Amino acid sequence: MPFTLGQRWISDTESELGLGTVVAVDARTVTLLFPSTGENRLYARSDSPVTRVMFNPGDTITSHDGWQMQVEEVKEENGLLTYIGTRLDTEESGVALREVFLDSKLVFSKPQDRLFAGQIDRMDRFALRYRARKYSSEQFRMPYSGLRGQRTSLIPHQLNIAHDVGRRHAPRVLLADEVGLGKTIEAGMILHQQLLSGAAERVLIIVPETLQHQWLVEMLRRFNLRFALFDDERYAEAQHDAYNPFDTEQLVICSLDFARRSKQRLEHLCEAEWDLLVVDEAHHLVWSEDAPSREYQAIEQLAEHVPGVLLLTATPEQLGMESHFARLRLLDPNRFHDFAQFVEEQKNYRPVADAVAMLLAGNKLSNDELNMLGEMIGEQDIEPLLQAANSNSEDAQSARQELVSMLMDRHGTSRVLFRNTRNGVKGFPKRELHTIKLPLPTQYQTAIKVSGIMGARKSAEDRARDMLYPERIYQEFEGDNATWWNFDPRVEWLMGYLTSHRSQKVLVICAKAATALQLEQVLREREGIRAAVFHEGMSIIERDRAAAWFAEEDTGAQVLLCSEIGSEGRNFQFASHMVMFDLPFNPDLLEQRIGRLDRIGQAHDIQIHVPYLEKTAQSVLVRWYHEGLDAFEHTCPTGRTIYDSVYNDLINYLASPDQTEGFDDLIKNCREQHEALKAQLEQGRDRLLEIHSNGGEKAQALAESIEEQDDDTNLIAFAMNLFDIIGINQDDRGDNMIVLTPSDHMLVPDFPGLSEDGITITFDREVALAREDAQFITWEHPLIRNGLDLILSGDTGSSTISLLKNKALPVGTLLVELIYVVEAQAPKQLQLNRFLPPTPVRMLLDKNGNNLAAQVEFETFNRQLNAVNRHTGSKLVNAVQQDVHAILQLGEAQIEKSARALIDAARNEADEKLSAELSRLEALRAVNPNIRDDELTAIESNRQQVMESLDQAGWRLDALRLIVVTHQ
């Protein structure tokens, strides 16, 4: 390779260095200085990864002084080039610019510039780039974008709510599903959609302190959303980095107590410009017209500053009318300002609910009923739809569904409130209780007596808590090394149960981590039982590994021993046997325990085993939960209310379990109260709201559509190709799982989402649900999205050369494959990609400008081509450069028509959809005050900005491939 001092070259492997200058040459090496970075590189002359920079007539070049020149002639003397042409700033002609004075910051970014500069990519990278463009564009156009990537079962009612709310501008809604129906998942789905589409960028989640880690885990494991947990320590640290500590993170979780405890902190939260606020357990925010609580006022203040608000709460019937009104008031204080007026409105919705029930029943409608429906809907031209609904035609069912939808749009709080009940959702298992009464060991009896004497001054509540866990009382006196498990009959029973049910996966829950750890040691040492442990002292990764070991069918752990806090947010529905080694203090925690297995999609009835010690608080509590509340075998929406009402009496019985006088009466009263409250709740159910929240056939179709997309084999092929080219090692572990690890030759040194130790992935939703250590890979997973960004944001694969062996064509025939991208630039919040994502347009031109792309499909053509090494490729490019220039000009002339057609189609679609949505909401606003003015304003503003952005849409050449025909 002939090198001369002063020549300009560019590095093939480090193009970001800009133009290099030859500053030293000897027999074996050459040294290049890259002035823009001040760095030197020493290369072997015989095989240096550099390309000579040579411009041609017609090119525009820049001098190191910054002025530009159109090249008209190129002269070479002693190996050095001089460019002659016209300056663009002064229009002076005949200007000479020696190559040594070229601008050193020059980087070849256009595909044609890279090709002519000899920066030729591997052929497989060009193919990957085109596929990345194609699939990326297709994914933006998918109707359920944002709903496919989460690690959740495809449950229709959850998808229905998320699909409805997630597409809205700044949604402000109340999610009030019954316990176990997945409010957290619904909220996560809405967040995922809003963040993925760009509708939201900053999110604040406020939860009770005990649920912070549960939310942190759920958001990361299910939705790949990495939230930061803010407590006093984190807040203090962040104050060093920013005036407002909350500006240091985009996604934040904090407790309600943390938010309201400090006035300055609350001000910082309000000023942090969140897009979405999520509040869990919102029913604990106490409100009355005269005296709202500090917690309620804190959330009210935040809700005034944050555009989107999701409140997760108990069902309206559990809350009571006034408390329910207080939640709605947080969402829209202008609409819900008068409680008495709200109560009156609710009464007026009964006829609407009756009308919906009438339509769904499928019976013939009388003329009076048809007239009533027409009046309620209040639309012109409704008559044909009413007639269709009342006919025997095939369209009758769809007409009735449309009428139901119109009724629900126009009446009630269905736009701001979503509520599903277990009665309305199928797929829940039965729950069967097995109680095992065991004698109280003498060691515990002695410890309890001594504790009673020494702890006489303790409160009844403290004594009650102690009595629930006799092993801890024993350890207080005997020390931490006391071997309580040697005589506790629950341990013997547990070992016997596990050894006789070796084939069953069993979840064992106890209150404390220490108990779980001690039980694991006993089971392992005495019976060789494989038991995983799960407690709050473990990191998320350690818990993942424990959960994965438990999930393994053949070689996995038979038992998972969980502490109360450690198991929050984790579900193990592949197991159906649960042992409660002790009992939790309140009914909410009991339901949370059972909820680890009692989920939609659980395939078997749940067997709940409760070994309890007689004459302890456990024996009191097991009876109260089962006989008083029926809380083991059914969900208990009344539990907390009754618990609060009998708290003092219950505590006394727990603190003194041997004094049982009157306990039977307490249980009887609780059962009567439970039945009465349950009947009251059932009577107050809002059927109209249930129908709307459930989604019916529409929701079922949504779930089926996403399930079909789960089987997309294009994703697997693309992902494997992507990982190969990035340089990620893949090790197939069987069971639809692959381990990815970084290699020594990565395209980038640190690939986002891939740790040094590697990660386990699966493309199978069922495997991902069973194996929490395996990440569920979809088009929406950060690993794929980061890979797409890496390829498409740089110049990987943007220029290449291939050989086509085809004896039907003359040797030396040239074809140029051009990949144009039609796109529009706009803020992410406009979600312009719904209408015009960056869309590839492929052209395959011969030297006469004939476009053969329609006749020659990309993948078929790609398989017929052979790669060319870089050295040969550079020679070929230099030989045919003029011809390629000519073909490029023909391509530029042809692309406009195709691009304009895409842009016009996008404009028409955007105008039609956004105008229709605006018209629909404006019409509904007349009859349903739950449609906010700011929502209408936002849609109109969004429509105008979208149309303006599409007017500015354009196109550019993204990649090209030069193809030369050969017969060899």
Swiss-Prot record:
A motif (DEAH box) lies at residues 280-283. NCBIfam families: PRK04914.1. One of its GO terms (molecular function) is ATP binding. Belongs to the SNF2/RAD54 helicase family. RapA subfamily. Pfam families: Helicase_C, RapA_C, SNF2-rel_dom, Tudor_1_RapA, Tudor_RapA. Signal peptide: none annotated. The gene is rapA. This is RNA polymerase-associated protein RapA.
